[in-house]
Regions:
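Conserved N-terminal phosphate-binding loop of PLP-dependent enzymes in the Aspartate aminotransferase
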Residues: 1-133
Length: 133
């Protein structure tokens, strides 16, 4: 894994930052940038359709689960508002073999865009179990 941080701005705010005004620990590394260019060149309609399919499945499954109040986000980058403390949910998920992160009282899901559907289904069922436990 190569760390890379990116910040993008639209035209409305483009004149706010000038070279040297904003930096990031993971920004500008030539090796990481070369890796990012390679990955971006691999994004195609087939990959994006797979992301839509996986996202739809994950949303449907989690929205129907008792103990999960809401599912928000875009694509496979999702946030779960849950009935129990986020840390407790994260610990349950880890015991089930699913690594999640927390943000205040939300659970953050960030699976790989190309996660195999069977693995995603296994993880989703584990999360449903964690919410209902």
């Amino acid at each position: 894994m190569l760390p890379l941080g990116v910040t993008m701005f639209g035209e409305r705010v483009a004149d706010v930052f000038h070279p040297g005004d904003h930096g990031t620990t993971f920004g500008g590394n030539p090796v990481c940038c070369a890796g990012a260019v390679n990955i971006l060149s691999r994004i195609d309609d087939r990959l994006l359709e797979g992301v839509r399919e996986r996202s739809d499945y994950l949303r449907r499954t989690l929205q129907a689960a008792p103990g999960i109040r809401s599912v928000t986000g875009m694509g496979l980058m999702l946030g779960l508002e849950i009935d129990i403390p986020a840390r407790e949910f994260a610990e349950r998920a880890l015991r089930e073999g699913v690594l999640v992160t927390t943000a205040k009282q939300k659970i953050r899901l960030l699976p790989a865009l190309n996660i195999p559907m069977e693995l995603l289904k296994t993880a989703a069922q584990a999360l449903v179990h964690c919410a209902a436990e």
